[in-house]
């Protein structure tokens, strides 16, 4: 492993960790940054699976007490059972559509122009959602009904379009469906666990031939870096939303998306030549 490869792994691990749970699209940022770093091909596909696992481990650690309570209470406690059922209900729509459309979406939509467009559109929707009056009926994740869970799960399917953001879709969807800002954010984190682990297992098995022992040092750098920076991002977001809206993230999405589109329009960067 040379120094440049290690630097690529470090940078992409940081990008994954910081963006995975913020409503700004980690996949979109990965596509753009990986293209700028000229990090692509089969190794990149395997690398992305590993760093996503590093990011999800950060959420598991952050909410370990809640997870442990649910696991212990699952056999006897209705609250734990209801929470688990709601999580499964929210998880299923992405599973079904992911299996059907994943390859098609990866082939045609995994490019910086799609990402930039989705960033801008998603940012505008986020601003609109934040300015609407919301009638909140779920103040905690335990107040969520199965209908709420299904709606959030359907909203998560929009994140199959790169640049949309899985967390952005579920959080904003949650706000529109009557969840408090804190509840929508926490449920988005919990929903990320089965969704991302399921996607990683599916992709890991499908592309198992890409994992080579020589790449393990690169994977280790990305995994650890993604874990550390995801921890920072999760803690920071939970603290931020206690007193702020998501408007700042919406404006960031719009500005970043317009910047990418401008560099393409004026010919400064040939994004159309980018490969996933």
Curated annotation (Swiss-Prot):
GO biological process: cell wall organization; peptidoglycan biosynthetic process; regulation of cell shape; response to antibiotic
TM region positions: 43-63, 85-105, 109-129, 184-204, 218-238, 254-274
Subcellular location(s) per record: Cell inner membrane
Catalytic activity: di-trans,octa-cis-undecaprenyl diphosphate + H2O = di-trans,octa-cis-undecaprenyl phosphate + phosphate + H(+)
Predominant cellular place of this UniProt entry's protein: membrane
GO cellular component: plasma membrane
Other information: Bacitracin is thought to be involved in the inhibition of peptidoglycan synthesis by sequestering undecaprenyl diphosphate, thereby reducing the pool of lipid carrier available.
Family from the record: Belongs to the UppP family.
Described purpose of this protein according to its UniProt entry: Catalyzes the dephosphorylation of undecaprenyl diphosphate (UPP). Confers resistance to bacitracin.
Protein name according to UniProt: Undecaprenyl-diphosphatase
Organism: Pseudomonas fluorescens (strain ATCC BAA-477 / NRRL B-23932 / Pf-5)
């Amino acid at each position: 492993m040379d120094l440049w490869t290690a630097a690529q792994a470090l940078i992409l691990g940081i990008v994954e960790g910081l963006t995975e749970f913020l409503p700004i699209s980690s996949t979109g940022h990965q596509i753009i940054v990986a293209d700028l770093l000229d990090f692509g091909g089969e190794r990149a596909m395997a690398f992305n699976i590993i760093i996503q696992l590093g990011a999800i481990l950060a959420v598991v650690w952050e909410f370990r007490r809640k997870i442990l309570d649910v696991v212990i209470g699952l056999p006897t406690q209705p609250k734990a059972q209801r929470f688990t059922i709601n999580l499964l209900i929210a998880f299923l729509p992405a599973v079904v559509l992911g299996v059907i459309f994943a390859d098609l979406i990866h082939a045609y939509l995994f490019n910086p122009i799609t990402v930039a467009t989705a960033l801008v559109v998603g940012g505008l929707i986020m601003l609109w959602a934040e300015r609407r009056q919301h009638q909140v009926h779920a103040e905690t994740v335990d107040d969520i009904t199965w209908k709420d869970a299904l709606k959030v799960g359907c909203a998560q399917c929009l994140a199959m379009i790169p640049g949309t953001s899985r967390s952005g879709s579920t959080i904003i969807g949650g706000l529109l469906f009557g969840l408090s800002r804190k509840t929508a954010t926490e449920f988005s984190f919990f929903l990320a666990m089965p969704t991302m682990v399921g996607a990683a297992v599916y992709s890991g098995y499908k592309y198992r031939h890409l994992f080579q022992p020589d790449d393990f040092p690169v994977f280790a750098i990305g995994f650890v870096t993604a874990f550390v920076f995801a921890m920072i991002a999760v803690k920071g977001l939970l603290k931020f939303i206690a007193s702020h809206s998501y408007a700042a993230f919406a404006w960031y999405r719009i500005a970043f998306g317009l910047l990418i589109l401008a560099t393409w329009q004026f010919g400064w960067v040939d994004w159309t030549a980018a490969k996933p």
